[in-house]
UniProtKB/Swiss-Prot annotation:
Positions of Mg(2+) binding: 191, 211
A molecular-function term among this protein's GO annotations: succinate-CoA ligase (GDP-forming) activity
PANTHER family to which the protein is assigned, alphabetical: SUCCINATE--COA LIGASE [GDP-FORMING] SUBUNIT BETA, MITOCHONDRIAL (PTHR11815:SF10), SUCCINYL-COA SYNTHETASE BETA CHAIN (PTHR11815)
Residues reported in the UniProt entry to bind ATP: 45, 52-54, 94, 99
Residues reported to bind substrate: 262, 324-326
Oligomeric form and interacting partners: Heterotetramer of two alpha and two beta subunits.
Protein name, per record: Succinate--CoA ligase [ADP-forming] subunit beta
Length: 393
């Protein structure tokens, strides 16, 4: 789960990473009010979950509240790499002496963690890697030992950070590692990590995280209940949101045939045969991808049907199940009970194809139930064709 910058900064503050918080608004008038309360020049920053905001005109300096209002007006509604700006972060502008780069991420290729650090911050890190690879340090991190101050200092040194900021930078790097581990993140990035101008003899300025990017591991949600508040429900399709609450793998599409399968491979194959059959029936298409995985209990099946039937475009549903550990009779019982649970909400024809473990018993259960909406079809091709035909009528 990618976070907005302001959410990343909330985690920075929680773990003691120095930075400037700012406030969030969804209007130009709100930006003006925040700027007035800050009483100093501000930065008006688009909140979108993608990079390249500055180049796209999504980050602007404003010397006065009136300028903040105008900049906010220009940024709101901006399309940045397909992301429409709906929220802004208004922060006090900071004096900058130098800009650095720092990140922690999963190195999947080498099955370890990776720290990246560079004295060349404030620009796209891909550009640094391509044009000045010697200025970008890539340091493997031992998952057991982690990052203490000595390791953090070494990372900063390898990134060619100046000697006078090593101690302060190391303290910040160690705190960012603490955040990375404690919050079950897969990416923590600061670009730029800045040094402010020195303010007198012996001062090397402050180290501040002026921008932040954090990606949280959605698979760790069970031990991170607080992360639910970061979910952007407004940007999520309501049906996908409902499916997520039931731990269903659901992706909404634009077709007319709802699909429920068990296992990603079978569900994708079902998608293909429905798409092919649809070409023979006026261009009917799959309406979704929904993989119920290994569990097809009545509750799971009811939740799945509730989600699929909630799509007003759906005209028929193809339930394609291969019985393995979860047997066909268990699935059939789940379908019957699910239809009882849903009652009148189940109002579209269901084409069911069962195969595999206990298929005979599963078919018998559905046949005896004799539900008016259920059509039991023996093969996947026949079932796809029937579902497409029903969706067209």
């Amino acid at each position: 789960m990618d976070l907005f910058e302001y959410q990343a900064k909330e985690l920075f503050a929680k773990h003691g990473v120095p930075g400037i918080q700012g406030r969030v608004t969804d209007s130009a008038e709100g930006a003006k009010t925040i700027a007035m309360e800050i009483g100093r020049p501000v930065m008006v920053k688009a909140q979108v979950k993608t990079g390249g905001r500055g180049k796209a005109g999504g980050v602007k300096y404003a010397a006065t509240p009136e300028e903040a209002y105008q900049q906010a007006k220009n940024i709101l509604g901006l399309d940045i790499k397909g992301h429409i700006v709906k929220k802004l972060l208004v922060v006090e502008a900071s004096d900058i002496a130098e800009e650095y780069y720092l990140s922690f991420l999963l190195d999947r290729a080498n099955r370890t963690y990776l720290a990246m650090c560079s004295v060349e911050g404030g620009m796209e890190i891909e550009e640094v890697a391509a044009t000045k690879p010697e200025r970008l340090a890539k340091v493997s991190v031992d998952a057991v030992k982690g990052v203490d101050l000595a390791c953090a200092r070494s990372i900063a040194q390898q990134g060619h950070l100046p000697a006078e900021v090593l101690d302060a930078a190391a303290a910040t790097i160690a705190k960012l590692w603490e955040l990375f581990v404690a919050e079950d993140a897969t990416l923590v990035e600061v670009n730029p990590l800045v040094r402010t101008p020195s303010r007198g003899y012996g001062s090397s300025g402050k180290i501040l995280a002026l921008d932040g990017k954090v990606t949280l591991d959605a698979n760790a949600r069970f031990r991170q209940p607080g992360h639910a508040e970061f979910e952007d429900r407004a940007a999520t399709d309501p049906l996908e949101w409902k499916a997520k609450q039931h731990n269903l793998n659901y992706i909404k599409l634009d077709g007319e045939v709802g699909i429920i399968g068990n296992g990603a491979g079978l569900t994708m194959s079902t998608f293909d045969v429905v798409a092919y059959a649809g070409e023979q029936h006026g261009g009917v298409k799959p309406a979704n991808f929904l993989d119920i995985g290994g569990g097809a209990s009545a509750e799971v099946m009811a939740a799945s049907l509730d989600v699929v039937l909630g799509d007003v475009q759906v005209k028929s549903v193809f339930v394609n199940i291969f019985g393995g550990i979860t047997t066909c009779d268990t699935v059939a019982t789940g379908i019957v009970k699910a239809l009882e649970i849903l009652g009148d909400e189940a109002n579209k024809p269901l084409v069911v194809r069962l195969d595999g473990n206990n298929v005979g018993e599963g078919r018998r259960i559905l046949a005896e139930a004799n539900h008016p909406l259920v059509m039991l079809v023996p093969t996947m091709d026949e079932a796809a064709n029937k579902a497409a035909e029903l969706a067209r009528t």
